[in-house]
């Protein structure tokens, strides 16, 4: 049925379930997690699920009476809203809550709601009602008609039109795919791998706080991780090879053997995901066959701008061909730099060298000291920067508001309201930005509640959580961000704003619920602001002196920004091609995935493949972006065009913000994605390619000097 990355709304008494279960009360009004009254305790997830199923059942009964078409669509949207409030709250809790009981109950809730979704997705009464509504001219708005059409298509992509036996198989496959995706993610979290390095002096001192000490006998005895070390024991470090730690080691460690060991281990675990990925590929392919498609990629790409995997592959191959000469030049430059630094004119350049030497080249050529840069980006000042940006562009202000007892999941969580002087509150944003054990390891924007029109006088405001993992340096009580972290913060803020500024009638199209290959455009667009001195000078101040960041330093940062743009572009094209290969048409005989990945790397990058490494077994984008990773490259092209043609001349003006909001943000997914883009930036932003649409690459390639 509907995609349940989406949400819904009611007919009569539409606020009854919501008011009973959600509050935005002040600090004195006790509530539950995220403002949901049910979630005062972990066990409350059970009641949360039960009430959502009960409310959805009432709405299904109402729809079965075939009311007017507008009421059918409203009720369908409420079912989605009701279910998604539980699903999304459970996902956020699962990823961020420090209490294990809450995490376990959230897991159970997610599984139970997923099972219930299968029941809804195979409900022929709902399907018949949606078909009736779609054909009815009484749907008075384009958004209502578009919602009806999308709901019908979502039903059919779920197999509602199949005979009962096939539909049962589709449901079983869908459940299996859900479980495999969860297993893949859990394996990554549970088995990051590790490498023990002796002596500890081989690791730079400023990284020691990221690592656990370990000891061994100087005579070569057994190793242990206790601190009961005598003088006969040698201290080393156990490096957990999770992506964040691996990145730090590869950037800062001069010892090539250490980098090599960490690179290989970090790109070889978790071993269990080899089998999980094989099963996932097979299950998704079988699902596509049941649905009458050639591949899972066909299913996933068809609703998007690209329309066809052939269009995607053609776009990627053309991009690969365009950037290869420049990428080869960059590779030679890095290799020559390594040879000079290590005094070996025949030294070969290996993948574990890339981050170390490119960072060194950027710093030396552009006089950029990352520690100096970070001193101008204490986290509280970066939050001020987001506030300055929103006020400049949209005339809206963020205000810190008190959290009600029971609403928060950690003492570090902050809640903001986005307020407009003429429109009132636009939505709510939780900030959970500090690193802690057991928390989601990356940065992401999580929806908690989507926006939707409840009546002519009432609008359900969106609620979003922005989650990051910023940590203090070992010698500081202040969290200071390196510039890449500032860029990530602005990226995720772009996603959050997409939801907060959306004003759709139906939550089905609220905010980021757009075509997959358009969804990353706002986040990529807002990355540009992290580089623009016109904004940076208004918030980036030295953590101890208060000095504004020097323009010369920002110019140096910008000089380093695109030094290896072709290499990075190659990497993204390579990832996207792997994604298409894994979930594209499958041969009759089993494939050696590792061999195919190695071959694609040789064809589309300038770097060696390291035998025995399998980085893709921890590439979680294969789960939620399966056959859709190309969307990041689409988004980069769209964002570059929009930045240069609309924002760059006057990036902080209310006129620029009004154009972005009125032409793009407020519509969410309620308008055709191609129409959204051309209304904002003109027809040159896209071009028709075969049966689909591809982005214009001119602006991006010029920006990157490719």
Swiss-Prot record:
Question: Active site located where?
Answer: 492
The record's subcellular locations are: Mitochondrion
Q: What happens when the gene is disrupted?
A: No visible phenotype.
Q: Where is the transit peptide?
A: 1-29
UniProt lists compositionally biased (Low complexity) regions at 214-227
Cellular component GO terms, alphabetically?
chloroplast thylakoid membrane; mitochondrion
A Gene Ontology biological process term: proteolysis
* InterPro entries xrefs: M3A_MIP, MetalloPept_cat_dom_sf, Neurolysin/TOP_dom2, Pept_M3A_M3B, Pept_M3A_M3B_dom
Checking PANTHER family in the record gives: MITOCHONDRIAL INTERMEDIATE PEPTIDASE (PTHR11804:SF79), PROTEASE M3 THIMET OLIGOPEPTIDASE-RELATED (PTHR11804)
Purpose: Aminopeptidase which cleaves preproteins, imported into the mitochondrion, to their mature size. Could cleave both preproteins and preprotein intermediates already cleaved by the mitochondrial processing peptidase (MPP).
What is this protein's record name? Mitochondrial intermediate peptidase, mitochondrial
From what organism does this protein derive? Arabidopsis thaliana (Mouse-ear cress)
Q: Which gene encodes it?
A: OCT1
């Amino acid at each position: 049925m509907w995609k349940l990355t989406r949400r819904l709304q009611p007919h009569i008494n539409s606020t009854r379930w919501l008011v009973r279960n959600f509050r935005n009360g002040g600090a004195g009004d006790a509530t539950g997690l995220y403002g949901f009254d049910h979630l005062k305790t972990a066990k409350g997830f059970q009641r949360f699920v039960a009430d959502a199923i009960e409310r959805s059942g009432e709405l299904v009964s109402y729809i079965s009476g075939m009311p007017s078409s507008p009421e059918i669509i409203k009720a369908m949207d409420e079912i989605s809203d009701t279910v998604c409030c539980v699903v999304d709250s459970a996902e956020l809790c699962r990823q961020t809550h420090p209490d294990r009981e809450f995490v376990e109950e959230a897991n159970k809730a997610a599984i139970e709601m997923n099972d219930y979704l299968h029941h809804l997705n195979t409900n022929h009464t709902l399907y018949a009602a949606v078909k009736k509504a779609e054909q009815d001219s009484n749907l008075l708005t384009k958004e209502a008609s578009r919602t009806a059409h999308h709901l019908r298509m979502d039903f059919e992509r779920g197999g509602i039109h199949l005979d009962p036996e096939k539909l049962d198989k589709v449901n079983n496959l869908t459940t299996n795919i859900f479980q495999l995706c969860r297993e893949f993610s859990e394996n990554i979290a549970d088995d990051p791998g590790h490498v023990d390095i002796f002596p500890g002096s081989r690791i730079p001192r400023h990284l020691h706080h990221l690592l656990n000490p370990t000891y061994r006998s100087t005579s070569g005895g057994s190793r242990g991780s206790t601190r009961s070390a005598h003088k006969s024991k040698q201290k080393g470090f156990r490096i957990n090879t999770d992506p964040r730690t691996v990145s730090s080691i590869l950037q800062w460690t001069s010892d090539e053997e250490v980098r090599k060991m960490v690179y290989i281990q970090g790109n070889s675990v978790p071993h269990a995901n080899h089998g999980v990925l094989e099963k996932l590929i097979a299950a998704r392919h079988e699902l596509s066959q049941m649905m009458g498609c050639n591949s899972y990629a066909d299913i996933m790409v068809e609703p998007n701008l690209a329309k066809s995997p052939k269009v995607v592959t053609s776009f990627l191959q053309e991009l690969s061909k365009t950037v290869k000469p420049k990428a080869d030049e960059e590779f030679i430059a890095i290799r020559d730099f390594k040879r000079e630094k290590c005094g070996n004119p025949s030294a070969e350049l290996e993948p574990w060298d890339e981050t170390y030497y490119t960072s060194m080249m950027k710093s030396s050529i552009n006089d950029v000291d990352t520690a100096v840069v970070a001193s101008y980006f204490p986290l509280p000042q970066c939050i001020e920067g987001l506030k300055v940006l929103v006020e400049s562009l949209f005339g809206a202000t963020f205000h810190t508001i008190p959290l009600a007892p029971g609403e928060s999941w950690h003492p570090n969580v902050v809640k903001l309201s986005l307020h407009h002087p003429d429109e009132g509150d636009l939505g709510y944003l939780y900030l959970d930005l500090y690193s802690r054990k057991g928390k989601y390891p990356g940065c992401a924007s999580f929806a908690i509640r989507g926006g939707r029109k409840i009546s002519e006088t009432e609008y359900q405001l969106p609620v979003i959580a922005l989650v990051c993992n910023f940590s203090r340096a070992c010698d500081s009580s202040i969290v200071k961000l390196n510039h890449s972290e500032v860029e990530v913060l602005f990226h995720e803020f772009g996603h959050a704003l997409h939801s907060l500024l959306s004003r759709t009638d139906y939550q089905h199209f609220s905010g980021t619920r757009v075509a997959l290959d358009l969804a990353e455009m706002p986040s990529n667009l807002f990355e540009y602001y992290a580089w623009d001195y016109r904004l940076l000078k208004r918030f980036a101040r030295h953590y101890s002196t208060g000095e504004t960041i020097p323009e010369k330093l920002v110019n140096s940062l910008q000089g380093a920004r695109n030094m290896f743009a072709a290499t990075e572009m190659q990497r993204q094209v390579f990832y996207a091609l792997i994604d298409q290969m894994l979930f594209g048409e499958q041969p009759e005989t089993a494939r050696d995935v590792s061999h195919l990945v190695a071959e694609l790397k040789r064809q589309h990058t300038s770097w060696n493949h390291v035998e025995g490494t399998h980085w893709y077994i921890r590439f979680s984008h294969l789960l939620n972006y399966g056959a859709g990773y190309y969307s990041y490259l689409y988004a980069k092209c769209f964002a570059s065009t929009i930045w240069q043609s609309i924002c760059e001349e006057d990036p902080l003006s209310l006129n620029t913000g009004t154009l972005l909001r009125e032409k793009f943000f407020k519509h969410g997914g309620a308008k055709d994605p191609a129409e959204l883009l051309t209304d904002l930036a003109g027809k040159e932003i896209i071009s028709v390619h075969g049966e689909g649409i591809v982005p214009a690459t001119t602006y991006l390639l010029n920006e990157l000097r490719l």
